[in-house]
Amino acid sequence: MSESDPVPGGRPGEVERATALSGELTGQGVHGVVLAYVDTAGIARVKTVPTAKLAAAAAWGVGMSPVFDTFLADDSIVGTDVLGSPDGDLRLYPDLDRLTMLAAQPGWAWAPVDRITQEGAPHPACGRTVLRRIVAGAAERHGITFRAAVEVEWVVGRGDAGGDAFVPAVSGPAYGAARQVELSDCAADLLAALAAQGVDVEQFHPEYAAGQFEVSVGALGPVAAADHSVLVRQTIRAVSARHGLRVSFAPAVLGQGVGNGGHLHLSAWRDGTNLHAGGTARCGMTAEAESFVAGVLGHLPALTALTAPSPASRLRLRPSQWAGVFTAWGRETREAALRIVTGTAGIRDRAANLEVKPVDLAANPYLALASVIAAGLDGLASSAPLPEEITGDPARLDPAAAAARGVRRLPVTLTESVAAFRTDGVLREALGPVLADAVIAVRLGEAGSVEGLDDDGVAAAYRWKY
């Protein structure tokens, strides 16, 4: 993965490398390279260049309007003081280190992009650039690096269902072998495609909701982990389409029931040592890891504007559904917003991590990871104390006892999340004013777009957007 921002004309050796890659891709029958980024609403937007134009894209980028930073999921446009107008242009620069032949889309390759201005400066609303900057800052100021992974949950619907209806393509029970058998051919093709693309799959299994599945991948650096989240979903869509199926990663496809999550797994490391294991603090954490977790916990209400950013997210964030809707943490407690994963004895030094549960796949993965890391670093820098651990379901706590222990419900509406984000100076500073204002404008636009709809209407509005 490229560690520096693109420059007009290309980084040293970049154009020559792109020329060589173009020849290799052409020789393998690749005709087009998909250039992908994720907008503020969490939608993956793309442009394609013919394989022969890859070197030109590496040198001078590909034009795209900055207006997409204030697109809503339904493609309507809101605005800020800086973004949302028809003016201006940006350049999309492919990260050649992440260039991937798409095994499920013969003739195609894929690459994530960084966005810079026509003058060659980093675009202030580029989430990938912001995440890279925050990660670099952590290494410079604290000597800390991170490993991250994003879980991917989705539902599989019948491709021949009428209109925008969701009809589960499988009927087996949650986590059941019958469901795996029903999707056997498609699942085998998916695993083969991911392996061919270099994606390290840890697990694949049926999930709880009707027609729901999950894939978990190995941990990488945060930018690469976010890239993989986008690539995995692209691959799932492509494989499923070849089998006549329709998939959705939306937080909720129905007004009731369990939704799709996108839990973040994150661990902080220094000099090759995992700070979440081998320490003398609770759950084997080091004192620094405890403070990092405390920072994430303290910023959780505002974080939901970035990690659970859709009106449909609220249909998923319900108590007692393992969605983590209370400001609580616990060791292997799946109802807590923050789950401390200690790992199995013998591999804890590499397996221990923090799982952030109030996250779904309507989130821009770059912004979600950037904001969670920024929150944790704030706690680490201030040596923030981690409150008492919670066991069991926080929803069952007596209200007075919950209040005394600092356990409170996360924002119930998207506008409440925005209000918390507005007052969170740490997160706003981490994103920068241009991007922070875009987040607010897009979230309020999404909330307004579904005003008056019941839960079923909200679910239907976002069912096939993600």
From Swiss-Prot:
It comes from the Bacteria. The keyword Cell membrane does not apply. Expressed in mycelium. L-glutamate binds at residues 259, 316, 334. ATP binds at residues 202, 267, 334, 339. Its cofactor is Mg(2+). Signal peptide: none annotated. Keywords: ATP-binding, Ligase, Magnesium, Metal-binding, Nucleotide-binding. It catalyses: spermine + L-glutamate + ATP = gamma-L-glutamylspermine + ADP + phosphate + H(+); spermidine + L-glutamate + ATP = gamma-L-glutamylspermidine + ADP + phosphate + H(+); putrescine + L-glutamate + ATP = gamma-L-glutamylputrescine + ADP + phosphate + H(+); cadaverine + L-glutamate + ATP = gamma-L-glutamylcadaverine + ADP + phosphate + H(+). GO terms for biological process: glutamate metabolic process; glutamine biosynthetic process; polyamine catabolic process; putrescine catabolic process; response to polyamine macromolecule; response to toxic substance; spermidine catabolic process; spermine catabolic process. InterPro entries: Gln_synt_N, Gln_synt_N_sf, Gln_synth/guanido_kin_cat_dom, Gln_synth_cat_dom. The keyword ATP-binding applies. Pathway: Amine and polyamine degradation; putrescine degradation; Amine and polyamine degradation; spermidine degradation; Amine and polyamine degradation; spermine degradation. Residues 127-466 form the GS catalytic domain. Binds 2 Mg(2+) ions per subunit. Its EC number is 6.3.1.-. GO terms for molecular function: acid-ammonia (or amide) ligase activity; ATP binding; glutamate-putrescine ligase activity; glutamine synthetase activity; ligase activity; magnesium ion binding. Mg(2+) 1 binds at residues 151, 263, 355. Involved in the catabolism of polyamines. Catalyzes the ATP-dependent gamma-glutamylation of polyamines. Substrates include putrescine, cadaverine, spermidine and spermine, with a preference for long-chain polyamines spermidine and spermine. Is not able to compensate for the loss of glutamine synthetases (GSs). No complementation of the L-glutamine auxotrophy of an E.coli glnA mutant. Involved in morphological differentiation and in the production of secondary metabolites. Belongs to the glutamine synthetase family. This is Gamma-glutamylpolyamine synthetase GlnA3. It comes from Streptomyces coelicolor (strain ATCC BAA-471 / A3(2) / M145). The gene is glnA3.
